[in-house]
């Protein structure tokens, strides 16, 4: 049975809008029972199947289904670029192609977070008339600075022409606003954009090719029972499904092994990026200034750095942020607290003094570069943007490459869909030309040139060894060296036992420059329907205490930038239990990446939940 998916008639859409007007429930709520020595956390139905649960007997499990030519998962820069380019080509050649785009955020851009200093190359290719259309590129870079920080001093480092971190010609943007604007352009071209729809499942044809996706169900109690308002998710079928989920996509995890996409690449390595927006004293405001630093407060073996961007947005606004590589080894390290400590540096604090923090957020990012890019195409689908990971790490940019990958995917798909001799060995189209075209583009050339810079930081000199490598080999050879360095394995394998590491004493936040975690999360606008199954699931409820806490001193309580994970005393008897405050989750994916036991599995909550970023 096929039912037309519309914003006005769809029951799931009506339910989603009903959720949006509910009052926010308390941020922290226990997720464990105290009736057992090893408490059981209420887990998702993917772990406890409904067909074995008597409470689901007699519930109508029929799903509405829709047919499209192309379905896109994720309305970020890559997904929107693909949608827009498809519709541009369809208009140019007078073809009728149905493109549906689903986004888990309540509004387009509400889950988007980046620095962001934009290389406009791909954006200008997509929108040659971007100025006439009023695109929100308001702040061209006017000053570009880089420095090494010690605890008390700032050592300037010249940015020579040709080095990857040069920002001449770039724009400082609020990426969420740019994505929102792109969403408007997509809808004007005829793309069907559906915010508040969380893609939860990959669907397959009988021959194993991708058939499309299904959005998640709504109206389920946190104990897994159906509510009276239960609505089944929606199926979206397509000839080609584009996965543009962003870093560490939860759907991509489902088919990486199925299609063996990582057989010929290194493990991906990640960073966690934390960001705040501040309104500062106008006398300190330098619109167009870009500052990047490495060094303090991180040691040389912990990859990371900072940014401070002055935006020209009608008020004295600055974006400050801190990135920590998730291959760090000390389980006592807290990326959030390192960020708060960094703001007290003598070269940073004066800019923020007297100002007001107005927003906070966090998101994981890919740092593996060329060596970690998986196979990009498979029968019925393909990967674009930050999902496979096209970030140019030394350039500290990935939006431009993500956009270009989306455009190239659209062009290859359009060519195959409109071919008069369309042939496919599988029910879902296998668009292999996309990967071939990407490898011939400036994206691949750019990533190949800088491929050795990030892994060069793994040596005995750490980050400083990477800087030396950049200054010698990249400066001379421009990426033409006849070797390719390898990454050292998955980030989840890098933590040392707590007994082998020195605890880190972090200063107490002063409430003016540095802040506590929960007051920070409150500025992210994060909210989830409280009475729903936990979307942060555990494969084994005993592992957090018996392994992570006993060996690594519970690193999840520190690597999470939203206070989701806490070890609290058992209500009865001695010992601790893991409490999951799922309401706090900002969808950064750090837990799914860094958990040393790989016991945490992040799945989508009900559509519309999560952060509500405004131009982050």
Curated annotation (Swiss-Prot):
The keyword Signal does not apply. Accepts electrons from ETF and reduces ubiquinone. Binds 1 [4Fe-4S] cluster. Its cofactor is [4Fe-4S] cluster; FAD. Its EC number is 1.5.5.1. It catalyses: a ubiquinone + reduced [electron-transfer flavoprotein] = a ubiquinol + oxidized [electron-transfer flavoprotein] + H(+). Belongs to the ETF-QO/FixC family. It comes from Rattus norvegicus (Rat). A ubiquinone binds at residues 304-305. Monomer. This is Electron transfer flavoprotein-ubiquinone oxidoreductase, mitochondrial. Pfam families: ETFQO_UQ-bd, Fer4_ETF_QO, Thi4. One of its GO terms (biological process) is fatty acid beta-oxidation using acyl-CoA dehydrogenase. The modification Phosphoserine is found at residue 550. FAD binds at residues 70-84. Residues 108-129, 427-446 dip into the membrane without crossing it. The modification N6-acetyllysine is found at residues 95, 131, 222, 356, 415. [4Fe-4S] cluster binds at residues 560, 585, 588, 591. The keyword Metal-binding applies. PANTHER family: ELECTRON TRANSFER FLAVOPROTEIN-UBIQUINONE OXIDOREDUCTASE (PTHR10617), ELECTRON TRANSFER FLAVOPROTEIN-UBIQUINONE OXIDOREDUCTASE, MITOCHONDRIAL (PTHR10617:SF107).
């Amino acid at each position: 049975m096929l039912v037309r998916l519309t914003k006005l008639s769809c029951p799931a859409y009506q339910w989603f809008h009903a959720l949006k007007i509910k009052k926010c429930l308390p941020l922290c709520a226990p997720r464990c029972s105290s009736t057992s020595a090893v408490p059981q956390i209420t887990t998702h139905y993917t772990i406890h199947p409904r067909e074995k649960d008597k409470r689901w007997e007699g519930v109508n499990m029929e799903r509405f289904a829709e047919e499209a030519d192309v379905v896109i998962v994720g309305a970020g820069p890559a997904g929107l670029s693909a949608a827009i380019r498809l519709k541009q080509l369809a208009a140019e050649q007078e073809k009728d192609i149905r493109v549906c785009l689903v986004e888990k955020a309540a509004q387009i851009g509400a889950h988007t977070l980046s620095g962001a200093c934009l290389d406009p190359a791909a954006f200008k290719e997509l929108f040659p008339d971007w100025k006439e259309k009023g695109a929100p590129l308001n702040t061209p870079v006017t000053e570009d600075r880089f420095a090494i920080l010690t605890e008390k001093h700032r050592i300037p480092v010249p940015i020579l022409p040709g080095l990857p971190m040069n920002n001449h010609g770039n724009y400082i943007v609020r990426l969420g606003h740019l994505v929102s604007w792109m969403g408007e352009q997509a809808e004007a071209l005829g793309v069907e954009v559906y915010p508040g729809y969380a893609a939860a499942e990959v669907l397959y044809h009988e021959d194993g090719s991708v058939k499309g996706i299904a959005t998640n169900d709504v109206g389920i109690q946190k104990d897994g029972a159906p509510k009276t308002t239960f609505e089944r998710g929606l199926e979206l079928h397509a000839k080609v499904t584009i996965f543009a989920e962003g870093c560490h996509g939860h759907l991509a995890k489902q088919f990486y092994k199925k299609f063996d996409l990582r057989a010929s690449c290194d493990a991906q390595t990640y960073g966690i990026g934390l960001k705040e927006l501040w309104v500062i004293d106008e006398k300190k405001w330098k619109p167009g200034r870009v500052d990047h630093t490495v060094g303090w407060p991180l040691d040389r073996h912990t990859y990371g750095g900072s940014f401070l961007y002055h935006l020209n947005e009608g008020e004295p606004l600055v974006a400050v942020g801190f990135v920590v590589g998730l291959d760090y080894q000390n389980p006592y390290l807290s990326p959030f607290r390192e960020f708060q400590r960094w703001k007290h540096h003598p070269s940073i604090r004066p800019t923020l003094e007297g100002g007001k923090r107005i927003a906070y957020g966090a998101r994981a990012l890919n740092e593996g570069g060329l060596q970690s890019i998986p196979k990009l195409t498979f029968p019925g689908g393909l990967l674009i943007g930050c999902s496979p990971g096209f970030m140019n790490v030394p350039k500290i940019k990935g939006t431009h490459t993500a956009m270009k990958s989306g455009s190239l995917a659209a062009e290859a798909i359009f060519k195959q869909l409109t071919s008069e001799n369309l042939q496919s060995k599988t029910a879902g189209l296998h668009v292999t030309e996309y990967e071939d075209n990407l490898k011939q583009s400036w994206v691949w050339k750019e990533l190949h040139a800088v491929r050795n810079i990030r892994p060069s930081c793994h040596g005995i000199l750490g980050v400083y060894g990477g800087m030396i490598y950049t200054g010698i080999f990249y400066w001379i050879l421009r990426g033409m060296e006849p070797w390719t360095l390898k990454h050292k394995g998955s980030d989840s394998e890098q933590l040392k036992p707590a007994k082998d590491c020195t605890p880190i004493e972090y200063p107490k936040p002063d409430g003016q420059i540095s802040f506590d975690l929960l007051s920070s999360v409150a500025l992210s606008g994060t909210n989830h329907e409280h009475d729903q199954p936990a979307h942060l699931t555990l494969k084994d409820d005993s592992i957090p205490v018996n392994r992570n806490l006993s060996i690594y001193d519970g690193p999840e309580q520190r690597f999470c930038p939203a206070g989701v994970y806490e070890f609290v005393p058992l209500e009865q008897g001695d010992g601790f239990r893991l409490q999951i405050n799922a309401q706090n989750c900002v969808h950064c994916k750090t837990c799914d990446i860094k958990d040393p036991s790989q016991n945490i599995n992040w799945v989508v909550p009900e559509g519309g939940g999560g952060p509500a970023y405004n131009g982050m």
